[in-house]
């Protein structure tokens, strides 16, 4: 797949057919949930064995490694998510129906996460009582996001670091103010079914790579208004864990 660079046609990312087939084969192998318990479809493999098994896939193509992002995303939710977040998001990632990303860096904030500028504000009255978690609207940009946009799975579940402004409307400085949010590409209901509404997450561009092109590397815009939700700009996100504890969750 390294000979066929991903293309963006303005609406969706086009990847080689081989990448689609590899993604399906990897999910069918059960490796996405290999280290999980039997009762959620796992094999209960030790992490060392899981890592060794993944080396065989890496030998075929490192590009299939994007599946490990999905596993990491779901593993985080199994520890820090609510029961419904686990059911709706994590289990669908383990099955391969959904895929996952981790959105930390921004154009102006690579490894310096204290400079994160993506904002998250409460989404109207009753935002705290949403069944999927306290509901916020996110606005900002995330850079160098692997597998951030594609058509390989039914949905993409972004885990996004953002700051909730204080009562004075200002961002809390440093990493203390960073929270973690689930931001699905396509909105879902409490049964994990797609509602038919696209979330306000848009691909701004693909980063060109020297190799490993089977996995896209992206710049994503959250909340720019390209896909308004209920007539408003702002990507809908659900809080994971406690406000201000985003790095603690993300570095699980």
Locations of regions flagged by a protein language model:
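Amphipathic, small/basic residue-rich leader segments at the start of a protein or domain
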Residues: 1-67, 84, 88
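Glycine- and acidic
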Residues: 3-8, 32-39, 54-60, 69-75, ...
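Short, solvent-exposed loop/turn segments at the edges of secondary structure
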Residues: 68-72, 97, 113-115, 131, ...
């Amino acid at each position: 797949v390294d000979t066929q660079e991903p293309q963006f046609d303005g609406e969706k990312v086009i990847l080689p057919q081989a990448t689609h087939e590899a993604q399906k084969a990897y999910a069918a192998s059960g490796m996405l949930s290999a280290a999980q318990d039997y009762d959620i479809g796992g094999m209960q493999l030790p992490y060392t064995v899981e890592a060794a098994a993944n080396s065989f896939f890496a030998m075929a193509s490192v590009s299939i490694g994007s599946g490990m992002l999905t596993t990491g995303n779901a593993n985080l939710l199994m520890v820090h998510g609510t029961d419904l977040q686990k059911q709706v998001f994590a289990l669908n990632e383990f099955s391969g129906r959904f895929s996952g990303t981790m959105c930390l860096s921004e154009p102006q904030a690579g490894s310096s996460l204290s400079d994160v500028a993506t904002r998250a504000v409460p989404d109207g009255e009753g935002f705290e009582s949403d069944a999927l978690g306290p509901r916020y609207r996110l606005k900002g940009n995330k850079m160098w996001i692997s597998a951030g946009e594609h058509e390989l799975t039914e949905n993409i579940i972004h885990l996004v670091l953002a700051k909730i402004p204080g009562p004075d409307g200002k961002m809390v400085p440093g990493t203390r103010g960073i929270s973690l949010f689930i931001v699905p590409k396509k909105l879902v209901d409490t049964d994990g079914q797609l509602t038919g509404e696209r979330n306000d997450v848009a691909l701004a561009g693909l980063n060109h790579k020297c190799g490993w092109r089977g996995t896209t590397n992206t710049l994503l815009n959250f909340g720019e208004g390209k896909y308004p939700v209920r007539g408003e700009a702002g990507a809908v996100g659900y809080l994971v864990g406690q406000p201000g504890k985003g790095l603690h969750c993300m570095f699980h």
